[in-house]
Amino acid sequence: MAVHWCGTGLSAIPGLKKLILDGNNVIVWNRTVSKARKALEGVQVTIYEFDIKSLEEKLAPTDIIVSMLPGDWHVPLAKLAISKKAHFVSSSYISPEMKNLHNAALKAGVSLVNEIGLDPGIDHLMAHKLVNELKKSELMNAETEVSFLSYCGGVPKVPNEFKYKFSWSPLGVLKALKSPSRSIKDFENFEVSRPWDAITSYNAPLNNPEEFEVYPNRDSLPFIEQYIFDRNWKIKQFVRGTLRLKGWAQAWASIFNEIETLNGQAGEKRLIEMSEQFWRDNAYADNEPDRVILCVDLKAEQNNHVIWHKTYKMDAWGDTRGTAMARLVSYPVSFAVKAII
């Protein structure tokens, strides 16, 4: 059995190194071999230039493909894995196209493992644990109101004037600002077309409590069922969102204003220009520590009184083992690979 790890970007290295150093049969595929060698300096491993046809030739039944490539590659690689009776792992959200491969994977007797990084990933574990604990409390009745919050973000450990730094291309962050979101607020669906219209303050209950800015991200509603909320629960609030440093909204106000005006091909071109400029001005320096904050919170109330409330939280930062983001994304991926092995 071989592990074909595709992609050696900044979020991939700690987990990849762990698999190699633990003695697993790992083959690395990267679009630029020299970059992969530099990232894995001092580690003995076979590295090939990424090409899906070359990967297909070397892929054998029971092998595992790990995709740490851009999202467009996940489904093609998962399809390749199924066709060769191999397994597939990624840290990314399950797209509708990936979901449609479920029955084919079952028929082939292989695993497709996704959403196994930080967010999505570790946040799911925290959410399921909270829901299970609330159910076991036996405090719930028909009048209980439930509020769920899950906020995650990567920020610079030492805040800068821009209130953010980039560890890879800013284009994904900029495009996400053009994405709508759905959540529940005050018992009703809350739909937002522009994230900056829903930015609020959040007091994170860390060991040293700290105020951040948060906003809803993507479509939160399918996770009500995924986290196995009781169908009879009255859901007052349910939101999965992004966390940023206090002052981020003000620092990015002019960016929000410009993004609102961008459309079509000219808009895409301008986004790329902005991305390149932000990368020059606000990329992490070598060995500069980042910081990751994750808070998952579940609260139950009856007659305006809190009867149950718990928060799972994580506050991590980069060190000699790698950035916090890289460790928290790639280590869970490596654990999933080990589970399949």
Regions found by a protein language model. Name each.
Residues 80-98:
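ADP-ribose/adenylate-binding Rossmann-like module
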Residues 42-53:
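Rossmann-fold cofactor-recognition segment
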